[in-house]
Amino acid sequence: MKSFTLSIAALSLAMSVQAAPSESSHHGQGTLKHWPPAAAKALNKMIARNANQSNFAVFDADNTIWRYDIEESSLPYLENKGVITRATLDPSLHLIEFKDTANYTETLYSYYNRLCEIDALICYPWAAQVYSGLKLRDLKGHIDELMAYPGTIPTSYWDGDVVVQEEINPARPFKGQIELINTLQANGIDVWIVSASNEEVVRMVVSDPKYGYNVKPENVLGVATMMRNTTSGDLTVSRKQIIDGTYNQTANLDLVLGSYLWTPATWYAGKWAAVLTYVDMWKKPILAAGDTPGSDTYMHFNVDVEKGGVHLWVNKSASNWEALQGLIKDNAEGQRENRLRVTADKNWVVVLPTDIQ
């Protein structure tokens, strides 16, 4: 693994330099202090070229703007607290039987993992729907506690027929991404978060000034579930309110999350569908940031490279890197075969999580 890390770091430098101007090398530039020098140069060049021209950038959330996964950590955290249990789970989310034995009662985290083994298209929505029945105000308190939690979260799961004890890391904001997001916004480049996690959970972090991202709540696109006003019985969802001009983040805190999904659903091709629906049908992002092959890459391969746009990749594993290389090759070939300008393999800035934390 050490040799792999070194090779990726070297490749990160090489790919960043391709898009970077010639400047003296130091760790970061200006406000991008928590970035490798070549990456900072490439990003600053792109920002300077695209500043104050009504451009926008898109970011995945988990393992992209913070380290680790906010849903995968909140599930065992809330289960351990007794906030989310089998008893509170919406009946519609009982998709398969729990795998209990005389000596082991399966956790919801384990249940989620077994759904993922069937298909990511099952467990992605399930993880966002699992908050059903919680009031937003209460969930916000739990998420704030989780973000401040100093240790790891104990849980367990089935690996085949063996029970494995696991310690889950809470989400940890990347300082580098906080710098980048704020720098983009300071230069008139709109930032959108497009996440496969629950939209309200992501909004609770990126739109709360204390976490430093300073993303407008209206600019968060995630897996949205219907919310209910328990007094009137009315159903709503933040995205509908935003479209209708009635969105009020504070007033929404008293709404209760449901399990029924709103669409587009922001995973895989749905991420790009959300951009087309809520951001712009024709304009392309000048930066797309992500870490998951096949899901985030629908955004990556639509970056406006003609404007010097950047494909930003946070490389968390060897397997993801290998998968990304295959996708870059396939998309470049697809562009070539269709007589389009080949951009899929251009302007990649690659960093490791440790580079920007």
Model-based region annotation:
Residues 60, 68, 133-135, 145, ...:
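Short, solvent-exposed linear motifs at loop/edge-of-secondary-structure regions
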Residues 69, 121-122, 200, 269:
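A generic alpha-helix surface/boundary motif
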Residues 20-38, 48-49, 54, 141-192, ...:
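C-terminal cap/substrate-recognition subdomain and adjoining C-terminal extension
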Residues 2-3, 216:
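Short, solvent-exposed coil/turn linker segments
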Residues 3-11, 17-61, 69-97:
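Non-catalytic pre-domain segments flanking phosphatase-related domains
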Residues 70-79, 84-168:
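A metal-dependent, Asp-based hydrolase signature
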Residues 9, 67-69, 202, 231:
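Active-site-proximal flexible loops/turns
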